[in-house]
């Protein structure tokens, strides 16, 4: 189970067609891109993550996306499925659908909806808000879990992520949790590294924002990833990681700085209200998906974002051929 967690999971975006439906053929093509030999050996798929707009998909659409991901992966790389519904019962049904489709594990995020559960949730004081739901899902399907702890009221200590003591409790009480996504602010991430390393069992630290991979690698805490950055910068990201793994810091820094990877990531992550849209814009500009449309009420791309990303992709050697 530890090896299952220590992979570079990509939070795959969901392409939509002109009518606003999930573009299944485009999704299959994107899956085949991720199945290229170099990534297949080390990577994994998260179908229906937050980046895949799971909050705005119907139950049948979620089923179809997972079914396609499992079909295309064909056992060559692991597939985890996002789970979301406004009710715990609905989340259990979603998890059962994913298990029936043959996924290797689940990608769980905190409850959403009421102000009680979202902006006002004190996760340190009331860990059961999420823990009870995780337990219900775990009891129903008994699959490995990657946690996406983006929930509750943001704090200066942790940023967007569920606080460290709550994370520790969840990991101790639910042995099926094998990986924890690092959705925290910089200081919070450093605290979480220590907390997760102090657990009685191995649990993978999964880097999220591509803009911090350099620090994760320097501290030797990049066990794996759960990141949407793979949607737009797979090749130089692998080069950068490989350089660090080979202890070639000079090469890693050259890829990161002179190679333009840092600047590309920094723009993508500079505005979290545009984050998942920018994943799609960049993937579209690279020719990996047919457009950058999101399902309303998600935002629409602005001309300046497109031009900035076009320039940054070119600077990172990722421009589409002919541009």
Predicted regions and their residues:
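General structural feature for long, well-ordered alpha-helical segments within catalytic domains
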Residues: 26-30, 61, 65, 90, ...
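Active-site beta->alpha loop and helix N-cap motifs at the rims of alpha/beta catalytic domains
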Residues: 2-161, 298-299, 319-323
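Hydrophobic transmembrane alpha-helix bundles
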Residues: 43-44, 78-90, 113-131, 147-156, ...
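C-terminal alpha-helical cap/extension of soluble enzyme domains
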Residues: 9-15, 37-42, 221, 234-323
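Short amphipathic alpha-helical segments, especially helix-boundary/capping motifs
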Residues: 5-10, 40-45, 69-72, 106-110, ...
């Amino acid at each position: 189970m530890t090896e299952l967690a220590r992979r570079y999971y990509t939070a795959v975006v969901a392409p939509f067609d002109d009518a606003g439906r999930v573009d299944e053929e485009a999704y299959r093509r994107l899956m085949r891109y991720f199945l290229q030999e170099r990534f297949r050996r080390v990577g994994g798929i998260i179908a229906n993550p937050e980046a895949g707009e799971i909050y705005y998909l119907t139950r049948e659409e979620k089923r179809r996306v997972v079914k396609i991901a499992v079909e295309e992966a064909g056992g060559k790389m692991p597939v985890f499925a996002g789970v979301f519904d406004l009710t715990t019962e609905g989340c259990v049904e979603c998890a059962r659908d994913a298990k029936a489709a043959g996924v290797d594990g689940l990608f769980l995020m905190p409850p959403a909806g009421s102000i009680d559960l979202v902006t006002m949730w004190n996760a340190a004081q009331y860990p059961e808000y999420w823990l009870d739901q995780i337990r219900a899902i775990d009891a129903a399907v008994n699959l490995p879990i990657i946690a996406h702890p983006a929930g509750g009221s943001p704090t200066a200590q942790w940023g967007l992520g569920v606080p460290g003591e709550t994370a520790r409790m969840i990991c101790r009480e639910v042995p099926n949790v094998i990986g924890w996504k690092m959705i925290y602010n910089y200081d919070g991430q450093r605290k979480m590294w220590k907390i997760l390393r102090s657990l009685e069992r191995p649990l993978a630290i999964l880097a999220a924002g591509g803009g911090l991979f350099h620090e994760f690698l320097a501290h030797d805490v990049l066990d794996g990833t759960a990141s949407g950055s793979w949607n737009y910068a797979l090749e130089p990201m692998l080069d950068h990681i490989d350089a660090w793994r080979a202890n070639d810091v000079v090469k890693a820094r050259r890829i990161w700085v002179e190679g333009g990877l840092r600047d590309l990531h920094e723009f993508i992550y500079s505005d979290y209200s545009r984050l998942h849209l920018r994943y799609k814009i960049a993937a579209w500009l690279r020719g990996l998906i047919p457009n950058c449309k999101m399902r309303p009420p998600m935002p629409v791309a602005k001309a300046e974002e497109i031009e900035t990303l076009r320039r940054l992709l070119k600077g990172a050697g990722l421009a589409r051929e002919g541009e």
